Amino acid sequence: MKIGIINTKIRTVFSAFACMIAASLVCTMPARAVVEININKGVIEPLPIAITDFLSADQLGSNITSVIAADLERSGLFAPIDKGAFIEKISNPDAAPRFEDWKVINAQALVTGRITKQPDGRLKAEFHLWDTFGGQRMIGQQFFTTPDNWRRVAHIIADAIYERLTGDKGYFDTRVVFVDESGPAQKRVKRLAIMDQDGANVRFISDGRALSLTPRFSPNRQEVTYMSFEGGSPKVYLLQLETGQRELVGNFPGMTIAPRFSPDGQKVVMSLLQDDGSANIYTMDLRNRTTTRLTSSQAIDTGASYSPDGSQIVFTSDRGGRPQLYVMGADGSNPRRISMGDGSYSTPVWSPRGDLIAFTKQSQGQFSIGVMKTDGSGERLLTSGFHNEGPTWAPNGRVLMFFRKAAGAGGPKLFTIDLTGRNERQIQTPNFASDPAWSPLLE
Protein backbone atom coordinates (compact mmCIF):
# COMPACT_ATOMS: atom_id res chain seq x y z
CA MET A 1 0.00 0.00 0.00
CA LYS A 2 1.39 3.39 -0.95
CA ILE A 3 1.06 6.44 1.26
CA GLY A 4 1.00 9.20 -1.32
CA ILE A 5 1.10 12.14 1.07
CA ILE A 6 4.58 13.60 1.22
CA ASN A 7 7.80 12.79 -0.58
CA THR A 8 10.09 11.89 2.29
CA LYS A 9 13.11 11.03 0.18
CA ILE A 10 16.26 11.32 2.27
CA ARG A 11 18.87 10.31 -0.26
CA THR A 12 21.49 13.01 -0.43
CA VAL A 13 21.41 15.37 -3.40
CA PHE A 14 25.02 16.30 -2.96
CA SER A 15 27.32 15.50 -5.82
CA ALA A 16 29.87 12.74 -5.35
CA PHE A 17 32.58 15.20 -4.53
CA ALA A 18 30.43 17.44 -2.36
CA CYS A 19 31.90 16.47 0.98
CA MET A 20 35.49 16.17 -0.15
CA ILE A 21 38.06 18.59 1.14
CA ALA A 22 39.09 20.90 -1.68
CA ALA A 23 42.84 20.80 -2.11
CA SER A 24 42.98 24.52 -2.77
CA LEU A 25 41.25 25.24 0.53
CA VAL A 26 42.95 22.91 2.94
CA CYS A 27 45.48 24.14 5.45
CA THR A 28 45.53 21.62 8.28
CA MET A 29 47.05 22.42 11.64
CA PRO A 30 49.62 20.22 13.34
CA ALA A 31 48.37 16.96 14.81
CA ARG A 32 47.44 18.61 18.13
CA ALA A 33 45.43 21.80 17.74
CA VAL A 34 45.79 24.65 20.19
CA VAL A 35 42.01 24.94 20.46
CA GLU A 36 40.03 21.81 21.27
CA ILE A 37 37.23 20.53 23.49
CA ASN A 38 37.68 17.48 25.70
CA ILE A 39 34.14 16.10 25.85
CA ASN A 40 35.17 13.17 28.03
CA LYS A 41 35.93 15.18 31.16
CA GLY A 42 32.32 15.78 32.24
CA VAL A 43 30.96 19.29 32.70
CA ILE A 44 32.90 21.74 30.54
CA GLU A 45 32.80 25.45 29.81
CA PRO A 46 31.36 26.12 26.31
CA LEU A 47 34.00 27.22 23.80
CA PRO A 48 33.59 30.85 22.61
CA ILE A 49 33.34 30.74 18.82
CA ALA A 50 32.76 33.53 16.28
CA ILE A 51 30.69 32.59 13.23
CA THR A 52 30.65 35.33 10.61
CA ASP A 53 27.87 35.69 8.05
CA PHE A 54 28.88 33.78 4.94
CA LEU A 55 29.34 36.13 1.99
CA SER A 56 26.53 35.74 -0.55
CA ALA A 57 24.47 37.74 -3.02
CA ASP A 58 21.34 37.40 -0.87
CA GLN A 59 20.16 36.45 2.62
CA LEU A 60 21.17 32.81 2.20
CA GLY A 61 24.64 33.27 3.66
CA SER A 62 23.21 34.73 6.85
CA ASN A 63 20.56 31.99 7.03
CA ILE A 64 23.19 29.27 6.79
CA THR A 65 25.28 30.96 9.47
CA SER A 66 22.26 31.10 11.80
CA VAL A 67 21.64 27.35 11.46
CA ILE A 68 25.32 26.54 12.08
CA ALA A 69 25.37 28.73 15.19
CA ALA A 70 22.12 27.24 16.50
CA ASP A 71 23.40 23.68 16.02
CA LEU A 72 26.64 24.34 17.85
CA GLU A 73 25.02 26.34 20.66
CA ARG A 74 22.37 23.68 21.24
CA SER A 75 25.08 21.05 21.80
CA GLY A 76 26.12 22.89 24.96
CA LEU A 77 29.77 22.71 23.92
CA PHE A 78 29.97 26.03 22.08
CA ALA A 79 29.07 29.63 22.91
CA PRO A 80 28.62 31.61 19.66
CA ILE A 81 29.68 35.22 20.18
CA ASP A 82 27.19 37.99 19.41
CA LYS A 83 27.97 39.49 16.00
CA GLY A 84 27.73 42.97 17.47
CA ALA A 85 31.04 42.33 19.22
CA PHE A 86 32.94 41.58 15.99
CA ILE A 87 35.72 44.06 15.19
CA GLU A 88 36.89 42.81 11.81
CA LYS A 89 34.49 42.71 8.87
CA ILE A 90 35.39 39.69 6.74
CA SER A 91 35.61 40.62 3.05
CA ASN A 92 37.65 37.64 1.87
CA PRO A 93 36.82 34.42 3.75
CA ASP A 94 39.77 32.63 2.12
CA ALA A 95 42.35 35.02 3.55
CA ALA A 96 43.78 34.81 7.04
CA PRO A 97 41.79 37.04 9.41
CA ARG A 98 43.29 39.62 11.74
CA PHE A 99 43.70 37.20 14.61
CA GLU A 100 44.32 39.94 17.18
CA ASP A 101 40.85 41.39 16.53
CA TRP A 102 39.28 38.04 17.35
CA LYS A 103 41.45 37.38 20.39
CA VAL A 104 40.30 40.71 21.85
CA ILE A 105 36.72 39.40 22.02
CA ASN A 106 37.95 35.99 23.27
CA ALA A 107 36.88 34.12 20.14
CA GLN A 108 38.92 30.95 20.48
CA ALA A 109 37.71 29.71 17.10
CA LEU A 110 36.46 31.57 14.03
CA VAL A 111 34.31 30.42 11.10
CA THR A 112 34.27 32.26 7.76
CA GLY A 113 32.60 31.28 4.51
CA ARG A 114 31.06 32.08 1.16
CA ILE A 115 27.98 30.97 -0.82
CA THR A 116 28.03 31.29 -4.62
CA LYS A 117 25.54 30.20 -7.26
CA GLN A 118 26.99 28.02 -10.02
CA PRO A 119 26.07 28.24 -13.73
CA ASP A 120 24.13 24.96 -13.44
CA GLY A 121 21.96 26.40 -10.66
CA ARG A 122 23.65 24.60 -7.79
CA LEU A 123 25.07 26.31 -4.74
CA LYS A 124 28.72 26.17 -3.79
CA ALA A 125 29.33 26.54 -0.06
CA GLU A 126 32.87 27.13 1.23
CA PHE A 127 33.94 27.53 4.83
CA HIS A 128 37.09 27.84 6.91
CA LEU A 129 37.65 27.11 10.60
CA TRP A 130 40.40 29.17 12.22
CA ASP A 131 42.26 28.76 15.50
CA THR A 132 42.51 32.40 16.52
CA PHE A 133 44.96 32.00 19.40
CA GLY A 134 47.12 29.58 17.41
CA GLY A 135 46.93 31.87 14.38
CA GLN A 136 46.24 29.05 11.93
CA ARG A 137 43.55 27.60 9.73
CA MET A 138 42.28 24.26 11.01
CA ILE A 139 40.14 23.10 8.08
CA GLY A 140 38.70 24.40 4.82
CA GLN A 141 36.00 22.58 2.87
CA GLN A 142 33.55 23.12 0.04
CA PHE A 143 30.20 21.54 -0.79
CA PHE A 144 27.81 21.61 -3.74
CA THR A 145 24.05 21.21 -3.46
CA THR A 146 20.70 22.44 -4.77
CA PRO A 147 19.25 25.69 -3.37
CA ASP A 148 16.39 23.92 -1.59
CA ASN A 149 18.90 21.83 0.38
CA TRP A 150 20.74 24.73 2.01
CA ARG A 151 19.84 23.67 5.55
CA ARG A 152 21.63 20.35 5.04
CA VAL A 153 24.76 22.25 4.02
CA ALA A 154 24.55 24.19 7.28
CA HIS A 155 24.16 20.99 9.33
CA ILE A 156 27.07 19.32 7.53
CA ILE A 157 29.32 22.32 8.17
CA ALA A 158 28.29 22.31 11.84
CA ASP A 159 29.16 18.60 11.99
CA ALA A 160 32.60 19.29 10.48
CA ILE A 161 33.29 22.01 13.05
CA TYR A 162 32.06 19.82 15.90
CA GLU A 163 34.25 16.91 14.80
CA ARG A 164 37.38 19.02 14.29
CA LEU A 165 37.11 20.65 17.71
CA THR A 166 35.93 17.67 19.78
CA GLY A 167 37.37 14.66 17.94
CA ASP A 168 33.87 13.11 17.88
CA LYS A 169 31.45 12.78 15.00
CA GLY A 170 28.71 15.39 14.94
CA TYR A 171 25.00 14.64 14.90
CA PHE A 172 23.42 17.67 13.23
CA ASP A 173 22.91 16.24 9.73
CA THR A 174 20.30 13.78 10.96
CA ARG A 175 16.55 13.33 11.06
CA VAL A 176 14.05 12.31 13.69
CA VAL A 177 10.89 10.30 13.14
CA PHE A 178 8.20 10.81 15.77
CA VAL A 179 4.49 10.69 16.54
CA ASP A 180 2.72 13.99 15.87
CA GLU A 181 -0.28 14.49 18.17
CA SER A 182 -3.05 16.96 17.36
CA GLY A 183 -6.63 17.59 18.45
CA PRO A 184 -8.33 17.35 21.84
CA ALA A 185 -7.07 14.80 24.36
CA GLN A 186 -10.20 12.66 24.02
CA LYS A 187 -9.87 12.50 20.22
CA ARG A 188 -6.15 12.85 19.71
CA VAL A 189 -4.98 12.20 16.14
CA LYS A 190 -1.56 10.55 16.02
CA ARG A 191 0.39 10.64 12.77
CA LEU A 192 3.92 9.61 11.96
CA ALA A 193 6.14 12.54 11.03
CA ILE A 194 9.76 13.12 10.11
CA MET A 195 11.87 16.25 10.63
CA ASP A 196 15.42 17.53 10.84
CA GLN A 197 16.97 17.05 14.28
CA ASP A 198 16.44 20.74 15.08
CA GLY A 199 12.70 20.59 14.37
CA ALA A 200 12.78 22.06 10.86
CA ASN A 201 11.22 20.57 7.71
CA VAL A 202 8.45 18.55 9.35
CA ARG A 203 6.71 16.15 6.94
CA PHE A 204 3.92 13.70 7.67
CA ILE A 205 4.39 10.09 6.58
CA SER A 206 1.05 8.66 7.71
CA ASP A 207 -2.43 10.10 7.40
CA GLY A 208 -3.67 9.65 10.97
CA ARG A 209 -6.66 7.47 10.11
CA ALA A 210 -5.16 4.65 12.20
CA LEU A 211 -3.25 5.07 15.45
CA SER A 212 0.50 4.72 14.75
CA LEU A 213 3.17 4.39 17.43
CA THR A 214 6.86 3.57 18.10
CA PRO A 215 8.45 4.46 14.74
CA ARG A 216 12.08 3.36 14.40
CA PHE A 217 14.66 4.05 11.67
CA SER A 218 16.50 1.38 9.76
CA PRO A 219 20.31 1.63 9.71
CA ASN A 220 20.17 2.67 6.04
CA ARG A 221 17.85 5.59 6.90
CA GLN A 222 15.50 4.62 4.05
CA GLU A 223 12.95 2.62 6.04
CA VAL A 224 10.90 3.00 9.20
CA THR A 225 9.28 0.21 11.17
CA TYR A 226 6.32 1.10 13.37
CA MET A 227 3.20 -0.22 15.06
CA SER A 228 -0.25 0.57 13.65
CA PHE A 229 -3.74 -0.15 14.96
CA GLU A 230 -5.18 -0.32 11.45
CA GLY A 231 -7.87 -2.99 11.57
CA GLY A 232 -8.19 -2.60 15.34
CA SER A 233 -5.30 -4.81 16.43
CA PRO A 234 -1.69 -3.56 16.63
CA LYS A 235 0.56 -4.86 13.88
CA VAL A 236 4.11 -4.05 12.84
CA TYR A 237 4.68 -2.43 9.44
CA LEU A 238 7.68 -1.51 7.32
CA LEU A 239 7.52 1.83 5.47
CA GLN A 240 9.80 2.83 2.58
CA LEU A 241 10.39 6.56 3.05
CA GLU A 242 11.34 7.27 -0.56
CA THR A 243 8.37 5.58 -2.22
CA GLY A 244 5.74 5.54 0.52
CA GLN A 245 5.31 1.80 0.02
CA ARG A 246 4.60 -0.19 3.17
CA GLU A 247 4.19 -3.84 4.08
CA LEU A 248 3.06 -5.90 7.03
CA VAL A 249 5.93 -7.50 8.97
CA GLY A 250 4.47 -10.95 9.50
CA ASN A 251 0.76 -11.71 9.66
CA PHE A 252 0.74 -13.04 13.22
CA PRO A 253 -2.56 -14.00 14.88
CA GLY A 254 -1.92 -11.90 18.00
CA MET A 255 -0.83 -8.34 18.59
CA THR A 256 2.72 -7.33 17.62
CA ILE A 257 4.35 -4.36 19.34
CA ALA A 258 7.62 -2.47 19.96
CA PRO A 259 9.52 -3.14 16.71
CA ARG A 260 13.17 -2.22 16.17
CA PHE A 261 15.76 -3.02 13.50
CA SER A 262 18.92 -5.02 14.05
CA PRO A 263 22.16 -3.05 13.44
CA ASP A 264 22.63 -4.64 10.01
CA GLY A 265 19.02 -3.88 9.02
CA GLN A 266 18.32 -7.51 8.13
CA LYS A 267 16.02 -8.28 11.05
CA VAL A 268 13.22 -6.68 13.03
CA VAL A 269 12.91 -7.59 16.71
CA MET A 270 9.45 -7.19 18.29
CA SER A 271 7.11 -8.56 20.93
CA LEU A 272 4.14 -10.84 20.21
CA LEU A 273 1.28 -11.04 22.69
CA GLN A 274 0.32 -14.61 23.56
CA ASP A 275 -3.11 -16.09 24.37
CA ASP A 276 -2.25 -16.30 28.08
CA GLY A 277 -1.57 -12.56 28.30
CA SER A 278 2.20 -12.84 28.22
CA ALA A 279 4.41 -11.26 25.57
CA ASN A 280 7.55 -12.80 24.13
CA ILE A 281 10.30 -11.44 21.94
CA TYR A 282 10.69 -12.62 18.35
CA THR A 283 12.84 -11.66 15.41
CA MET A 284 11.86 -11.71 11.76
CA ASP A 285 14.54 -12.05 9.10
CA LEU A 286 13.50 -9.57 6.40
CA ARG A 287 15.37 -11.50 3.72
CA ASN A 288 13.34 -14.70 3.95
CA ARG A 289 10.54 -13.75 6.41
CA THR A 290 11.48 -16.48 8.88
CA THR A 291 10.71 -15.85 12.56
CA THR A 292 12.68 -16.91 15.62
CA ARG A 293 11.38 -16.88 19.18
CA LEU A 294 13.92 -15.50 21.66
CA THR A 295 12.06 -15.57 25.00
CA SER A 296 9.56 -18.09 26.38
CA SER A 297 8.51 -16.73 29.76
CA GLN A 298 5.05 -16.25 31.26
CA ALA A 299 5.91 -12.58 31.71
CA ILE A 300 5.67 -9.54 29.47
CA ASP A 301 8.97 -9.22 27.61
CA THR A 302 9.12 -6.15 25.38
CA GLY A 303 11.10 -3.08 24.32
CA ALA A 304 14.01 -5.00 22.79
CA SER A 305 17.06 -3.08 21.56
CA TYR A 306 20.25 -4.50 20.00
CA SER A 307 23.80 -3.68 21.01
CA PRO A 308 25.67 -1.87 18.18
CA ASP A 309 27.56 -5.04 17.20
CA GLY A 310 24.33 -7.06 17.11
CA SER A 311 25.56 -9.64 19.61
CA GLN A 312 23.26 -8.74 22.53
CA ILE A 313 19.74 -7.47 23.20
CA VAL A 314 18.48 -5.41 26.13
CA PHE A 315 14.77 -5.65 26.95
CA THR A 316 12.16 -5.03 29.63
CA SER A 317 10.52 -7.90 31.52
CA ASP A 318 8.27 -8.17 34.57
CA ARG A 319 9.30 -11.80 35.16
CA GLY A 320 10.63 -10.78 38.58
CA GLY A 321 7.54 -8.77 39.56
CA ARG A 322 8.19 -5.17 38.51
CA PRO A 323 9.40 -4.30 34.98
CA GLN A 324 13.19 -4.46 34.98
CA LEU A 325 15.96 -4.43 32.38
CA TYR A 326 17.55 -7.65 31.15
CA VAL A 327 20.32 -8.40 28.68
CA MET A 328 20.54 -11.60 26.63
CA GLY A 329 22.44 -12.91 23.66
CA ALA A 330 21.01 -12.01 20.26
CA ASP A 331 19.89 -15.65 20.00
CA GLY A 332 17.99 -15.42 23.31
CA SER A 333 20.68 -17.12 25.38
CA ASN A 334 21.78 -16.26 28.91
CA PRO A 335 19.19 -13.63 29.96
CA ARG A 336 20.32 -11.71 33.04
CA ARG A 337 18.87 -8.81 34.98
CA ILE A 338 20.95 -5.63 34.99
CA SER A 339 18.71 -3.03 36.70
CA MET A 340 18.91 -3.25 40.48
CA GLY A 341 17.50 0.07 41.69
CA ASP A 342 14.11 0.82 43.18
CA GLY A 343 11.19 1.41 40.84
CA SER A 344 10.30 0.13 37.38
CA TYR A 345 12.39 0.35 34.20
CA SER A 346 11.27 0.46 30.57
CA THR A 347 12.10 1.62 26.99
CA PRO A 348 15.79 0.60 27.08
CA VAL A 349 17.94 1.56 24.12
CA TRP A 350 21.60 0.73 23.60
CA SER A 351 24.01 3.59 22.89
CA PRO A 352 25.58 3.65 19.39
CA ARG A 353 28.93 3.76 21.20
CA GLY A 354 28.12 0.50 22.97
CA ASP A 355 29.03 1.80 26.42
CA LEU A 356 25.66 2.80 27.91
CA ILE A 357 21.99 1.86 27.95
CA ALA A 358 19.40 4.63 28.25
CA PHE A 359 16.04 3.93 29.87
CA THR A 360 12.86 5.31 31.42
CA LYS A 361 12.51 4.82 35.18
CA GLN A 362 9.34 5.17 37.23
CA SER A 363 9.95 5.68 40.94
CA GLN A 364 8.38 7.67 43.77
CA GLY A 365 5.74 9.18 41.53
CA GLN A 366 8.18 10.49 38.92
CA PHE A 367 9.33 9.40 35.48
CA SER A 368 13.05 9.83 34.80
CA ILE A 369 15.38 9.46 31.83
CA GLY A 370 18.62 7.78 32.84
CA VAL A 371 21.64 5.84 31.66
CA MET A 372 23.60 2.91 33.05
CA LYS A 373 26.57 0.85 31.96
CA THR A 374 25.75 -2.31 30.05
CA ASP A 375 26.30 -4.45 33.15
CA GLY A 376 23.83 -2.32 35.13
CA SER A 377 26.42 -0.40 37.13
CA GLY A 378 26.80 3.37 37.24
CA GLU A 379 23.11 4.26 37.00
CA ARG A 380 22.56 8.03 36.57
CA LEU A 381 19.26 9.88 36.22
CA LEU A 382 19.60 12.81 33.81
CA THR A 383 16.17 14.39 34.24
CA SER A 384 13.07 13.66 36.32
CA GLY A 385 9.52 14.96 36.44
CA PHE A 386 5.84 14.22 36.08
CA HIS A 387 6.28 12.19 32.88
CA ASN A 388 9.50 11.73 30.89
CA GLU A 389 9.72 8.76 28.54
CA GLY A 390 11.14 7.16 25.41
CA PRO A 391 14.84 8.07 25.09
CA THR A 392 16.57 7.81 21.71
CA TRP A 393 20.28 8.32 21.05
CA ALA A 394 21.95 10.77 18.71
CA PRO A 395 24.22 8.76 16.39
CA ASN A 396 27.36 9.87 18.23
CA GLY A 397 26.04 8.62 21.59
CA ARG A 398 26.48 11.99 23.30
CA VAL A 399 22.88 13.31 23.37
CA LEU A 400 19.44 11.84 24.04
CA MET A 401 16.03 12.94 22.80
CA PHE A 402 12.87 12.03 24.71
CA PHE A 403 9.31 13.23 25.23
CA ARG A 404 7.86 14.95 28.27
CA LYS A 405 4.32 15.63 29.39
CA ALA A 406 3.77 18.17 32.14
CA ALA A 407 1.08 17.73 34.77
CA GLY A 408 -2.36 19.03 33.87
CA ALA A 409 -3.76 19.87 30.46
CA GLY A 410 -1.69 19.77 27.32
CA GLY A 411 0.32 17.07 25.64
CA PRO A 412 3.84 15.72 25.20
CA LYS A 413 6.77 17.69 23.80
CA LEU A 414 10.23 16.69 22.61
CA PHE A 415 13.42 17.53 24.47
CA THR A 416 17.12 16.78 24.18
CA ILE A 417 19.59 16.34 27.02
CA ASP A 418 23.30 15.59 27.07
CA LEU A 419 25.02 13.04 29.27
CA THR A 420 25.88 15.62 31.92
CA GLY A 421 22.17 16.23 32.48
CA ARG A 422 22.84 19.98 32.45
CA ASN A 423 22.08 20.85 28.84
CA GLU A 424 18.37 20.28 28.28
CA ARG A 425 16.59 21.86 25.29
CA GLN A 426 13.07 21.71 23.89
CA ILE A 427 12.66 20.85 20.21
CA GLN A 428 9.86 22.92 18.69
CA THR A 429 7.25 20.95 16.72
CA PRO A 430 3.99 22.12 15.09
CA ASN A 431 1.84 20.09 17.48
CA PHE A 432 2.34 17.86 20.49
CA ALA A 433 4.94 15.15 19.85
CA SER A 434 6.04 11.82 21.34
CA ASP A 435 7.98 8.62 20.59
CA PRO A 436 11.04 10.14 18.86
CA ALA A 437 13.64 8.01 17.08
CA TRP A 438 16.93 9.48 15.85
CA SER A 439 18.36 8.52 12.46
CA PRO A 440 21.99 7.69 11.73
CA LEU A 441 24.00 10.44 10.04
CA LEU A 442 22.69 11.11 6.55
CA GLU A 443 24.86 10.46 3.53
UniProtKB/Swiss-Prot annotation:
Against SUPFAM superfamilies, the record matches this protein to: TolB, N-terminal domain, Tricorn protease N-terminal domain
Principal localization reads: periplasm
Signal sequence residues? 1-33
For the biological process aspect of GO, one term held by this record is: protein import
Q: Name one GO cellular component term.
A: periplasmic space
Location in the cell reads:
Periplasm
| A Pfam family assignment | TolB_N
What Gene3D superfamilies does the record point to? TolB, C-terminal domain, TolB, N-terminal domain
The answer to whether the entry has keyword Signal is yes
The record ties this protein, via InterPro entries, to: 6-blade_b-propeller_TolB-like (IPR011042), PD40 (IPR011659), Tol-Pal_TolB (IPR014167), TolB_N (IPR007195)
Keyword terms of this UniProt record: Cell cycle, Cell division, Periplasm, Signal
**What do we know about how this protein assembles, alone or with others?**
The Tol-Pal system is composed of five core proteins: the inner membrane proteins TolA, TolQ and TolR, the periplasmic protein TolB and the outer membrane protein Pal. They form a network linking the inner and outer membranes and the peptidoglycan layer.
Instruction: Name the family the entry cites.
Output: Belongs to the TolB family.
Q: What does this protein do?
A: Part of the Tol-Pal system, which plays a role in outer membrane invagination during cell division and is important for maintaining outer membrane integrity.
Q: What is this protein called?
A: Tol-Pal system protein TolB
Classification from the root reads: Bacteria, Pseudomonadati, Pseudomonadota, Alphaproteobacteria, Hyphomicrobiales
Gene name? tolB
